[in-house]
Amino acid sequence: MCSGPKQGLTLPASVDLEKETVITGRVVDGDGQAVGGAFVRLLDSSDEFTAEVVASATGDFRFFAAPGSWTLRALSAAGNGDAVVQPSGAGIHEVDVKIT
């Protein structure tokens, strides 16, 4: 069970971080500058597509996902990149995706 809500910095007040696993981060370029508008895909441990969101103008993205191993893949006109995150439980798990 995974989903991709509207992107932004603030989590909705209804999110219970003791029960929800939240994967959040930013898409950045090689200089660490935000890449807005990138498509960010959430892939499961077998590399199967699970969800996709469009990063905010400041490169922010967020997914609600189950604990486990996930690959985040960012696709943009400026380049592409992958990052792996392995949340073991509820809470916020931050990872940036660097594109090249």
From Swiss-Prot:
Gene Ontology CC annotation, any one: peptidoglycan-based cell wall
InterPro entries reported for this sequence: CarboxyPept-like_regulatory (IPR008969), DUF1416 (IPR010814)
Pfam families xrefs: DUF1416
Domain of life: Bacteria
Keywords in alphabetical order: Isopeptide bond, Ubl conjugation
Covalent cross-link site, Isoglutamyl lysine isopeptide (Lys-Gln) (interchain with Q-Cter in protein Pup): 98
Keyword Ubl conjugation in record: yes
Remaining remarks: Pupylation of this protein has been demonstrated, however it is unknown if it is the product of this gene, of the identical gene Rv3118 (AC P0CG96), or of both of them.
Protein's recorded name: Uncharacterized protein Rv0814c
Taxonomic lineage of the native organism: Bacteria, Bacillati, Actinomycetota, Actinomycetes, Mycobacteriales
